[in-house]
């Protein structure tokens, strides 16, 4: 499986959909597949081949699957889920103790380094975080960030969905089962959505689509 792919890109200041992101995507999942194959071959030698694997020199019929990991990603620190982009860099969650901020760990590090985040009890920090929440987790309207930072820190609804599908297609050859691929579409017409689905349908490496999240908001710009 895999989790926090987008978080990894954010930690390394890599723009989703860039050539570098494609190199990382290829290297990451080809390495996982290589290690998994070596492991199942070793297990077959040590424990023997199951009846359905006789003659293939492996212990497993399937090796890799990418689950959504939505709950797990939240529990381990609000990292990005599975192979999907981060929906927002700040949001609020109601708990028995009251309302708390959930902040993407990469974004938290950035705003701490820039001196924007002082503490969660600080009035200026709270105003900043609530402003991000009010913009669906987007930072594109904030003057504290450079254009390069804004390019890296785009939410799922601001990332070009075709770039997302291209990464899905690229890694599928290393994944045994279909990926849990979510689509995040902002301000798209029915015709544009149909065109996107056709793009996915005609790609032999895109085996399924999971959830389709739609958003109508004039403040959200997809790049």
Where are these regions (language model features)?
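Internal maturation/activation junctions in enzymes
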Residues: 9-69, 148, 180, 196
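A generic alpha-helix surface/boundary motif
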Residues: 3, 38, 105-106
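Conserved alpha/beta enzyme-core scaffolds, especially Rossmann-like or related mixed alpha/beta domains
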Residues: 1-4, 9-27, 152-155, 171-188
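Catalytic alpha/beta core of large soluble enzyme barrels
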Residues: 64-223
């Amino acid at each position: 499986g895999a989790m926090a792919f987008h978080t990894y890109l954010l930690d390394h200041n890599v723009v989703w959909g860039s050539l570098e992101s494609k190199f990382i995507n290829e290297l990451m999942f080809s390495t996982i597949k290589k290690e998994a194959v070596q492991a199942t071959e070793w297990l077959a030698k040590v424990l023997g081949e199951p009846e359905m694997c006789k003659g293939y020199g492996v212990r497993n019929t399937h090796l890799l699957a990418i689950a959504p990991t939505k709950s797990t990603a939240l529990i381990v620190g609000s990292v990005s889920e599975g192979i999907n982009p981060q929906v927002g860099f700040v949001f609020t969650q109601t708990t028995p103790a009251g309302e708390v901020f959930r902040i993407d760990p990469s974004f938290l590090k950035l705003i701490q380094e820039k001196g924007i985040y002082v503490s969660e009890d600080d009035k200026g920090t709270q105003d900043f975080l609530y402003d991000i929440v009010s913009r669906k987790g987007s930072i594109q309207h904030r003057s504290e960030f450079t254009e390069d930072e804004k390019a890296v820190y785009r939410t799922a609804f601001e990332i070009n969905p075709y770039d997302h599908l291209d990464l899905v297609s690229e890694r599928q050859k290393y994944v045994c089962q279909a990926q849990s691929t979510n689509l995040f579409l902002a301000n798209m017409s029915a015709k544009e959505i149909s065109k996107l689905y056709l793009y996915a349908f005609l790609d032999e490496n895109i085996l399924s689509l999971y959830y389709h999240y739609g958003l109508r908001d004039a403040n959200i710009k997809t790049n």
